[in-house]
UniProtKB/Swiss-Prot annotation:
Topology relative to the membrane: Multi-pass membrane protein
Lineage: Eukaryota, Fungi, Dikarya, Ascomycota, Pezizomycotina
Protein's UniProt keywords contain Membrane: yes
Compartment(s) of residence: Endoplasmic reticulum membrane; Endoplasmic reticulum-Golgi intermediate compartment membrane; Cytoplasmic vesicle, COPII-coated vesicle membrane
Disulphide bonds in the chain: none
Biased composition (Basic and acidic residues): 11-21
Family membership: Belongs to the VMA21 family.
Record-given protein name: Vacuolar ATPase assembly integral membrane protein VMA21
Protein backbone atom coordinates (compact mmCIF):
# COMPACT_ATOMS: atom_id res chain seq x y z
CA UNK A 1 0.00 0.00 0.00
CA UNK A 2 1.11 3.50 -0.62
CA UNK A 3 0.38 6.66 1.25
CA UNK A 4 -0.36 10.04 -0.13
CA UNK A 5 2.58 12.42 0.06
CA UNK A 6 1.90 16.11 0.39
CA UNK A 7 4.49 18.25 -1.36
CA UNK A 8 4.52 21.96 -0.55
CA UNK A 9 5.29 24.82 -2.94
CA UNK A 10 8.89 24.87 -1.75
CA UNK A 11 9.33 21.22 -2.76
CA UNK A 12 9.47 19.84 0.79
CA UNK A 13 7.25 17.08 2.04
CA UNK A 14 4.56 18.27 4.47
CA UNK A 15 2.61 16.42 7.14
CA UNK A 16 -1.14 16.57 7.59
CA UNK A 17 -0.62 18.85 10.58
CA UNK A 18 1.39 21.30 8.49
CA UNK A 19 -1.42 21.72 5.96
CA UNK A 20 -4.33 21.70 8.42
CA UNK A 21 -6.68 24.53 7.37
CA UNK A 22 -7.89 25.08 10.93
CA UNK A 23 -4.50 26.33 12.06
CA UNK A 24 -2.78 25.56 15.33
CA UNK A 25 -4.99 24.55 18.24
CA UNK A 26 -5.64 27.00 21.06
CA UNK A 27 -4.44 26.54 24.59
CA UNK A 28 -5.55 23.26 26.12
CA UNK A 29 -7.35 22.85 29.42
CA UNK A 30 -4.81 21.31 31.78
CA UNK A 31 -6.87 21.56 34.95
CA UNK A 32 -7.24 18.26 36.81
CA UNK A 33 -10.41 16.27 36.22
CA UNK A 34 -10.87 15.76 39.97
CA UNK A 35 -10.54 18.67 42.41
CA UNK A 36 -7.61 18.58 44.81
CA UNK A 37 -9.95 18.62 47.81
CA UNK A 38 -11.49 15.32 46.71
CA UNK A 39 -8.06 13.72 46.33
CA UNK A 40 -7.04 15.05 49.75
CA UNK A 41 -10.16 13.57 51.39
CA UNK A 42 -9.63 10.24 49.67
CA UNK A 43 -6.00 10.05 50.79
CA UNK A 44 -6.90 11.06 54.35
CA UNK A 45 -9.60 8.42 54.64
CA UNK A 46 -7.33 5.82 53.06
CA UNK A 47 -4.71 6.56 55.70
CA UNK A 48 -7.37 6.39 58.43
CA UNK A 49 -8.75 3.12 57.04
CA UNK A 50 -5.30 1.55 57.24
CA UNK A 51 -4.02 2.91 60.54
CA UNK A 52 -7.11 3.31 62.74
CA UNK A 53 -8.32 -0.32 62.81
CA UNK A 54 -4.80 -1.72 63.17
CA UNK A 55 -3.91 0.80 65.87
CA UNK A 56 -7.19 0.13 67.66
CA UNK A 57 -6.59 -3.61 67.58
CA UNK A 58 -3.09 -3.51 69.02
CA UNK A 59 -3.91 -0.83 71.59
CA UNK A 60 -6.99 -2.63 72.90
CA UNK A 61 -5.48 -6.13 72.84
CA UNK A 62 -2.53 -4.95 74.94
CA UNK A 63 -3.99 -2.30 77.25
CA UNK A 64 -7.79 -2.54 77.37
CA UNK A 65 -8.86 -6.16 76.96
CA UNK A 66 -5.77 -7.80 78.46
CA UNK A 67 -4.93 -10.12 75.56
CA UNK A 68 -8.46 -10.98 74.41
CA UNK A 69 -8.04 -10.82 70.64
CA UNK A 70 -11.72 -11.46 69.91
CA UNK A 71 -12.94 -8.24 71.51
CA UNK A 72 -10.00 -6.29 70.09
CA UNK A 73 -10.71 -7.61 66.58
CA UNK A 74 -14.39 -6.77 66.89
CA UNK A 75 -13.58 -3.23 67.98
CA UNK A 76 -11.11 -2.88 65.09
CA UNK A 77 -13.84 -4.00 62.64
CA UNK A 78 -16.22 -1.46 64.16
CA UNK A 79 -13.61 1.28 63.72
CA UNK A 80 -13.14 0.31 60.05
CA UNK A 81 -16.90 0.64 59.56
CA UNK A 82 -16.90 4.02 61.31
CA UNK A 83 -14.24 5.31 58.92
CA UNK A 84 -16.14 3.94 55.92
CA UNK A 85 -19.45 5.46 57.02
CA UNK A 86 -17.75 8.81 57.70
CA UNK A 87 -16.29 8.79 54.18
CA UNK A 88 -19.66 8.00 52.59
CA UNK A 89 -21.37 10.79 54.56
CA UNK A 90 -18.67 13.28 53.59
CA UNK A 91 -18.92 12.24 49.93
CA UNK A 92 -22.70 12.76 49.95
CA UNK A 93 -22.32 16.21 51.52
CA UNK A 94 -19.67 17.17 48.98
CA UNK A 95 -21.91 16.02 46.12
CA UNK A 96 -24.88 17.95 47.52
CA UNK A 97 -22.74 21.09 47.76
CA UNK A 98 -21.78 20.74 44.09
CA UNK A 99 -25.42 20.25 43.08
CA UNK A 100 -26.47 23.35 45.05
CA UNK A 101 -23.71 25.37 43.36
CA UNK A 102 -24.84 24.17 39.93
CA UNK A 103 -28.43 25.13 40.77
CA UNK A 104 -27.31 28.64 41.81
CA UNK A 105 -25.42 29.05 38.54
CA UNK A 106 -28.47 27.88 36.58
CA UNK A 107 -30.63 30.50 38.34
CA UNK A 108 -28.12 33.23 37.47
CA UNK A 109 -28.29 32.30 33.79
CA UNK A 110 -32.08 32.72 33.76
Amino acid sequence: MTTRRIIGQDGEEKTYLDVDPRGPPGPSNISPAVPASVIWKLMSFTFAMITLPIGTYFFTVNYVFGGNATYAGALAAIMANVVLIAYVIMAFKDDQAEQAEDAREAKKEL
